[in-house]
Swiss-Prot record:
It comes from the Bacteria. Pfam families: RecR_C, RecR_HhH, RecR_ZnF, Toprim_4. A zinc finger (C4-type) spans 57-72. This is Recombination protein RecR. Disulfide bonds: none annotated. PANTHER family: RECOMBINATION PROTEIN RECR (PTHR30446:SF0).
Amino acid sequence: MQTSPLLETLMEALRCLPGVGPKSAQRMAFQLLQRDRSGGMRLAQALTRAMSEIGHCADCRTFTEQDICTICANPRRQQNGQICVVESPADIHAIEQTGQFAGRYFVLMGHLSPMDGIGPGDIGLDRLEQRLEKESVTEVILATNPTVEGDATANYIAEMCGQYGVVASRIAHGVPVGGELEMVDGTTLSHSLAGRHVIKF
């Protein structure tokens, strides 16, 4: 079936989003054109502004339209002395929602992967090392993903922290709250057993 070249271009552009295949892209395009043209215009304007104006924080590398993001610019966060290392800006959002962390962050934008040619310089570890050297950092919390690459990245950073006398800790991994043991995979259960703690009364 022949369709408008502009419509084809729109559907192809929508497919750059994660999890969006040809059918989903078609539904989105038709929805915008049939029922929500004003929403489509707002989306186009927001995308144009975001793509041209959002960059990276000079300190932590998260997304921001300022030179320094609001978290890094917060004096109380600066005095905290803790840096939480994460793989992506989305991880910051997840941790912030817990309300349990009051320090600053460092975003790797990925993880070490020698097989893919991704080394320390590609994930900003030179910048992190500068922060360890110049700032009063008391602890680096390693919140990389619980994968082989995430663990390797955490170990590399922990070794780097040791050179500057900075404590490096790894977030706990294990059984999710409300989960049933029989449904948990063996690797996760192993981590849970290894990371057990004493119950104090």
